C-alpha cells in the first residue's frame, strides 16, 4: 500500500474517526461503506488486529513496510514495544508540524515538509519521516499556527516549534490498541 490518495470519507466510515486524516465528516452516510454494509457481522480476532494496524497506517500516512520498519526499531528498545512504536510515529516531522497547528491535516503538513517550508535547527529538511528529538527547534516559513490544542510536549512561539520533553502515550490525539498492532507484526514476523 503506497500513500493513500483515494476517498477519505470511505476510510473514516470503515475505521472510525481519524482526526489528522481529513477535515471532512461523514454526515450523510454514517454506516460502513460498501454494497452489503447493512449486514453487520461480528469481526474476527484477526480482523480487529488488522483494523488496528490499518488505523495506524492511515492516521500517520505511512505504508505497511514503513510501519514494519518502525516496529522492528521499537522491538529493539528496552521499553514496551507498543508504546515505543507510538512514540516513534508521534515524533515524525510531518506529525509534529500538524500537532503544532501549522497545517489543518497530516497530508497538508506532509506537503509543507516536502516543499521545503520547514527547517529543523536552522537546516532545511524535506523528509516527512525525519525523527524529531527533544530540544529540536522546528521553524515553519510564513504560516501562523492555529489555535488548536497543543500537546504538552510541544512549545510554539511565532513560527518556531520546540519539543520540550519526550512524548507520553496519554498525550496522543488518536486512540488505538497498540498491543493488537504488536501482536499482528509479531505474528507476521516483521
From Swiss-Prot:
GO BP: any one term: ribosomal small subunit biogenesis
Annotated GO MF terms: rRNA binding; structural constituent of ribosome
Protein name from the UniProt record: Small ribosomal subunit protein uS4c
Location of the S4 RNA-binding domain: 92-152
Matches recorded under HAMAP family: Ribosomal_uS4_B (MF_01306_B)
Quaternary structure and partners: Part of the 30S ribosomal subunit. Contacts protein S5. The interaction surface between S4 and S5 is involved in control of translational fidelity.
Lineage start: Eukaryota, Rhodophyta, Bangiophyceae, Cyanidiales, Cyanidiaceae
UniProt xrefs under InterPro entries: Ribosomal_uS4, Ribosomal_uS4_bac-type, Ribosomal_uS4_CS, Ribosomal_uS4_N, S4_RNA-bd, S4_RNA-bd_sf
GO CC, alphabetical: chloroplast; small ribosomal subunit
Keywords attached to this entry: Chloroplast, Plastid, Ribonucleoprotein, Ribosomal protein, RNA-binding, rRNA-binding
Function description: One of the primary rRNA binding proteins, it binds directly to 16S rRNA where it nucleates assembly of the body of the 30S subunit.
Gene3D superfamilies linked: Ribosomal Protein S4 Delta 41, Chain A, domain 1, RNA-binding S4 domain
Record-linked Pfam families: Ribosomal_S4, S4
Keyword Nuclease belongs to the record: no
Amino acid at each position: 500500500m503506497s500513500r493513500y490518495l483515494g476517498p477519505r470519507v470511505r476510510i473514516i466510515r470503515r475505521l472510525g474517526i481519524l482526526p489528522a486524516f481529513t477535515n471532512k465528516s461523514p454526515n450523510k452516510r454514517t454506516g460502513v461503506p460498501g454494497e452489503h454494509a447493512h449486514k453487520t457481522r461480528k469481526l474476527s480476532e484477526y480482523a480487529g488486529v488488522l483494523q488496528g494496524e490499518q488505523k495506524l497506517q492511515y492516521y500517520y500516512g505511512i505504508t505497511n513496510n514503513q510501519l514494519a520498519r518502525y516496529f522492528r526499531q521499537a522491538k529493539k528498545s528496552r521499553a514496551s514495544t507498543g508504546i515505543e512504536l507510538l512514540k516513534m510515529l508521534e515524533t515524525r516531522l510531518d506529525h509534529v508540524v500538524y500537532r503544532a497547528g501549522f497545517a489543518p491535516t497530516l497530508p497538508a503538513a506532509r506537503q509543507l515538509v516536502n516543499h521545503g517550508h520547514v527547517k529543523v535547527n536552522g537546516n532545511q529538511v524535506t523528509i516527512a519521516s525525519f525523527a524529531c528529538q527533544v530540544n529540536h527547534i522546528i521553524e515553519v516559513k510564513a504560516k501562523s499556527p492555529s489555535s488548536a490544542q497543543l500537546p504538552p510536549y510541544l512549545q510554539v512561539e511565532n513560527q518556531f516549534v520546540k519539543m520540550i520533553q519526550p512524548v507520553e502515550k496519554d498525550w496522543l490525539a488518536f486512540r488505538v490498541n497498540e498491543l493488537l498492532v504488536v501482536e499482528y507484526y509479531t505474528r507476521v514476523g516483521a
